[in-house]
């Protein structure tokens, strides 16, 4: 069988206008340099860029098949990380974790405006391939490691694990009603990267009795850790999130396991967008007046926040309730990102109240938006 060259195998990005980040950064020369390289687990550059080939409109189009992908293919990953995270060069380093909820300033909002709060992060177990390349045996072992650790949680964090394969119709119905159940993903990243192989083998959901602390196992990331509750107490959600995450890490270490961590990139996740903290702190925020302001989108961006619809990404806002979160994941600690959300949401509510009173907000907007 003939051996084809890298240039013969180079993806066709030109015909779609290089809409994804990979298409903008991966040249034929770079591809040729990376073409023959393999990680210790056998992951190739083609495995990592497959989402960009199958769906050229995707923003990033790049996944890591294992933690080592970030180093072996760093020429491409570093370029994409630098663009995605607004400047993060080869010598930059992500700060150490900071889960100190007591150091937060504010964070308790009027439930008239903040309907609920949610904080999540992604984690990967050190020593295993990531979802795009993980084997069935590895995935099952990851499930075992995490479930064993969760069994050690006590008090308000104690809960029950529901494997997708063994779920009863009643359990499934309840989890759907709670909006907890993740179905087989159909998104381009998961499907094109191969992360949905063998579904639903070794996938499951765990939650505590109060349904305020939730774990997803083997979805886009090996572990998704989520804290949430109704109302406006963001600080309480971060406290529970931090306490649960710290306890899980401690229980894992007792059995000789830990989460994958890079001194430069922070916690390792499947998608480069989630490197660093992997943290997304969000609130459901009702803004009847501000959402009608002509600079609403610009105001959100000015506070380094991101806006989604009520149901999350690619949904519309219902009754002017928006999902507002931190935009970045890298270059700041967990506490700093939650504080950024708190500060920004506080300003948005301040503007909403002024508009409710029939006043202008033009004079109190960030300097970059005045005029």
UniProtKB/Swiss-Prot annotation:
It catalyses: L-lombricine + ATP = N-phospho-L-lombricine + ADP + H(+). GO terms for cellular component: extracellular space. Residues 113-355 form the Phosphagen kinase C-terminal domain. The keyword Transferase applies. ATP binds at residues 116-120, 179, 224, 280, 308-313, 323. The keyword Hydrolase does not apply. Gene3D superfamilies: ATP:guanido phosphotransferase, N-terminal domain, Glutamine synthetase/guanido kinase, catalytic domain. One of its GO terms (molecular function) is creatine kinase activity. One of its GO terms (biological process) is phosphocreatine biosynthetic process. Keywords: ATP-binding, Kinase, Nucleotide-binding, Transferase. Its EC number is 2.7.3.5. Pfam families: ATP-gua_Ptrans, ATP-gua_PtransN. Residues 1-86 form the Phosphagen kinase N-terminal domain. Homodimer. Belongs to the ATP:guanido phosphotransferase family. This is Lombricine kinase. It comes from Eisenia fetida (Red wiggler worm).
């Amino acid at each position: 069988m003939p051996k084809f060259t890298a240039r013969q195998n180079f993806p066709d990005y030109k015909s779609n206008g290089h809409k994804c980040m990979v298409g903008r950064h991966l040249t034929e020369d770079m591809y040729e340099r990376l073409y023959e390289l393999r990680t210790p687990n056998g992951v190739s550059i083609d495995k990592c860029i497959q989402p960009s080939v199958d769906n050229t409109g995707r923003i990033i189009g790049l996944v890591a098949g294992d933690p080592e992908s970030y180093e072996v293919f760093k020429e491409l990953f570093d370029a994409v990380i630098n663009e995605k995270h607004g400047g993060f060069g080869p010598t930059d380093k992500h700060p150490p974790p900071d889960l100190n909820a007591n150091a937060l300033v504010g964070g308790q909002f009027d439930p008239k405006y903040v309907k609920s709060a949610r904080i999540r992060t992604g984690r990967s177990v050190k020593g295993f391939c990531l979802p795009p390349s993980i084997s069935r045996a590895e995935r099952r072992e990851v499930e075992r490691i995490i479930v064993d650790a969760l069994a050690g949680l006590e008090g308000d964090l104690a809960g029950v694990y529901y494997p997708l394969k063994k779920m009863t119709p009643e359990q499934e119905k309840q989890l759907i009603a709670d909006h907890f159940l993740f179905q087989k993903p159909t998104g381009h990243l998961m499907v094109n990267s191969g992360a949905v192989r063998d579904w639903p083998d070794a996938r499951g959901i765990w939650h505590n009795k109060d349904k305020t602390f939730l774990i997803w196992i083997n979805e886009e990331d090996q572990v998704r850790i989520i804290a949430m509750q109704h109302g406006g107490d963001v600080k309480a959600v971060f406290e529970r999130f931090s306490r649960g995450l710290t306890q899980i890490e401690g229980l894992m270490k007792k059995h000789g396991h830990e989460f994958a961590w890079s001194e430069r990139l922070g916690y390792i996740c499947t998608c480069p967008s989630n490197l660093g903290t992997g943290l997304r702190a969000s609130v459901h925020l009702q803004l009847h007046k501000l959402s009608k302001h002509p600079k609403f989108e610009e105001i959100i961006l000015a506070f380094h926040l991101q806006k989604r619809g009520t149901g999350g990404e690619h949904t519309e806002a219902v009754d002017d309730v928006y999902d507002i979160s931190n935009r970045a994941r890298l270059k700041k600690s967990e506490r700093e990102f939650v504080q950024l959300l708190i500060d920004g949401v506080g300003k948005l509510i301040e503007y909403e109240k002024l508009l409710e009173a029939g006043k202008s907000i033009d004079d109190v907007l960030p300097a970059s938006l005045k005029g």
